């Protein structure tokens, strides 16, 4: 079977919402929503191998540490394992006073009774009721009309009131989800929710949560936002309900749908860390939270150690986080492209510690979420001078002059092409050494003596010549400064084009780095590098580095 030439013969476009006066497009999100993690329930039920009690407790503690205040822990009536985990949390004192446990149940009395029993002794709890309301579920799955579906929800809501009254020591909050809300007629979803809220007698001081799931993502995010805005406008007792979002990622836009839903008036978000969940997953709470953070809004969740959180999630879920996953993937703060690296390097150079973050290509400062800058720039065959220069400067304190960056980047590119792999900072540093600092043929500096004579510098150098066998030579020269004097004593014509120097490190362990660009015998300009404790020695080493590289190049050209 192949894809259809005319998919409209099999698939229908989701209808748009008649909301010409929609206001959400002009809104911005200015505060964090209430966060509810469904990792231990929705996320866990989607795993090939569900978590055991040890992993669940580890995950629970991670969610608490991050700052999630409402955590859906299980479906207690589904299994003894789920029931026991709720009891472990309550009896083991694992629920902080500022955190609320949430559990889920279907609309059957035996399941509801078992669910409330699991929560006995809890200080406060959210009990979450759901039943599917969309036309396809009514027709295909349940064979119920609208009245029947509404009756199921209302009867279950009454049972919630009954069983909650039997445990008055617990502070209860009720939640209702018209499952498949985004595929349900809006008027009918409102009708069912109004009826449930009426049974629960919601008030501003005892709010009911109305969770509006995109159980399966069936439309573009703007349509979901229209549905949420319409619902917020039309639901009864709006001041007594919290509108909660529960999006999935079937079309790849779960985060966008959630953000637009918040703009449309929602108060709360249910989802999973890094987007685990059925099929393509629930909305990723981390991405939504850090999207807020990078817009200057405190998400009230702490991902200062995002890699530590990822480690727990990966080990508990036994699913690796994709290397391109927003904010947390191994490669999301990494630039291989030369132009990107150059922009990032310049951004870091100009970034003020207490200023607005404006580093190109990095929407968040990696340090804010516990990431180092070491992996921001990595070098492969697509990289340019900026990335190479950045790595040498950050890791080794070596600041290459601009024109030398261009020359050395070509050296690095030849090596990455040869290897077919990326190069680490250590490998790049080693290549710099072999190409420049170890360029000692045909002349290697052995020693030098510098003195002032009548306002001029006089230099005498001893070099080891590796031309026709190894011999030591002595050259003398005078000039206005040490380098000019050395050039005057060389046996070949040399023109210095550029010279730079800087310190590496500080204090007694500091060294001097010297960079020289020169032209030998009128040929093309080449660069040399010298590093030494003494700045004069470093500059002489740099000159011999460039001289040798040029002469070797000329010899190869003539061969």
From Swiss-Prot:
Compartment annotation: Cytoplasm
Pathway(s) the chain acts in: Amino-acid biosynthesis; L-leucine biosynthesis; L-leucine from 3-methyl-2-oxobutanoate: step 1/4
UniProt cross-references to Gene3D superfamilies, sorted A to Z: 3.30.160.270, Aldolase class I
Binding site for Mg(2+): 42, 246, 248, 282
Described function: Catalyzes the condensation of the acetyl group of acetyl-CoA with 3-methyl-2-oxobutanoate (2-ketoisovalerate) to form 3-carboxy-3-hydroxy-4-methylpentanoate (2-isopropylmalate).
Family statement drawn from the similarity comment of this UniProt entry: Belongs to the alpha-IPM synthase/homocitrate synthase family. LeuA type 2 subfamily.
Quaternary structure (record): Homodimer.
Name assigned to this protein: 2-isopropylmalate synthase
Primary gene name: leuA
């Amino acid at each position: 079977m192949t894809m259809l030439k005319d998919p409209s013969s099999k698939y229908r476009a989701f209808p748009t919402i008649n909301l010409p006066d929609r206001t959400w497009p002009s809104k911005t999100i200015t505060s964090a929503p209430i966060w509810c993690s469904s990792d231990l329930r929705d996320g866990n039920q989607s795993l090939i191998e569900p978590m055991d009690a040890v992993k669940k407790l580890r995950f629970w503690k991670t969610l608490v540490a991050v700052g999630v205040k409402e955590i859906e822990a299980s479906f207690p009536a589904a299994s003894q394992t789920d029931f026991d985990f709720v009891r472990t949390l309550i009896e083991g004192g694992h629920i902080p006073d500022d955190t609320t446990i949430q559990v889920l149940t279907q609309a059957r009395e035996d399941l509801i009774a078992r669910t409330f029993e699991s929560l006995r002794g809890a200080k406060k709890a959210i009990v979450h009721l759901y039943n599917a309301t969309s036309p396809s579920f009514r027709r295909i799955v349940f064979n119920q009309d609208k009245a029947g579906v509404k009756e199921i929800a209302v009867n279950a809501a009454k049972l919630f009131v009954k069983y909650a009254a039997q445990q008055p020591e617990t502070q209860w909050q009720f939640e209702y989800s018209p499952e498949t809300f985004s595929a349900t007629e809006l008027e009918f979803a409102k009708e069912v929710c109004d009826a449930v809220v009426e049974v629960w007698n919601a008030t501003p001081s005892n709010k009911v949560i109305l969770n509006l799931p995109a159980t399966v993502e069936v439309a573009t995010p703007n349509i979901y936002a229209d549905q949420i805005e319409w619902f917020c406008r039309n639901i009864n007792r709006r001041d007594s309900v919290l509108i909660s979002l529960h999006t999935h990622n079937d079309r790849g836009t779960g985060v966008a749908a959630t953000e637009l839903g918040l703009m449309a008036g929602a108060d709360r978000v249910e989802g999973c860390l890094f987007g685990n969940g059925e099929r393509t997953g629930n909305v990723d709470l981390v991405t939504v939270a850090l999207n807020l953070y990078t817009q200057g809004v405190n998400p009230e969740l702490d991902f200062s150690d995002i890699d530590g959180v990822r480690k727990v999630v990966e080990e508990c879920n036994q699913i690796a986080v994709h290397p391109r996953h927003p904010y947390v993937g191994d490669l999301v703060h990494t630039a291989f492209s030369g132009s990107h690296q150059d922009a990032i390097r310049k951004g870091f150079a100009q970034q003020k510690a207490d200023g607005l973050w404006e580093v190109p290509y990095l929407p968040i400062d990696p340090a804010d979420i516990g990431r180092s800058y070491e992996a921001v720039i990595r070098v492969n065959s697509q990289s340019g001078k900026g990335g190479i220069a950045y790595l040498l400067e950050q890791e080794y304190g070596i600041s290459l002059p601009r024109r030398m960056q261009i020359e050395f980047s070509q050296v690095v590119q030849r090596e990455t092409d040869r290897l077919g792999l990326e190069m680490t900072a250590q490998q790049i540093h080693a290549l710099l050494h072999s190409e420049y600092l170890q360029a000692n043929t045909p002349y290697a500096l052995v020693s030098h003596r510098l003195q002032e004579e009548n306002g001029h510098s006089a230099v005498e150098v001893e070099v080891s010549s590796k031309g026709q066998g190894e011999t030591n030579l002595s050259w003398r020269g005078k000039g206005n400064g040490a380098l000019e004097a050395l050039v005057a004593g060389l046996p070949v014509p040399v023109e210095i084009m550029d010279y730079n120097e800087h310190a590496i490190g500080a204090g007694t362990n500091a060294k001097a780095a010297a960079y020289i660009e020169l032209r030998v015998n009128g040929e093309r300009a080449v660069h040399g590098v010298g590093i030494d404790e003494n700045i004069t020695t470093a500059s002489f080493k740099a000159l011999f580095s460039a001289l040798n590289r040029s002469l070797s190049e000329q010899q190869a050209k003539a061969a």
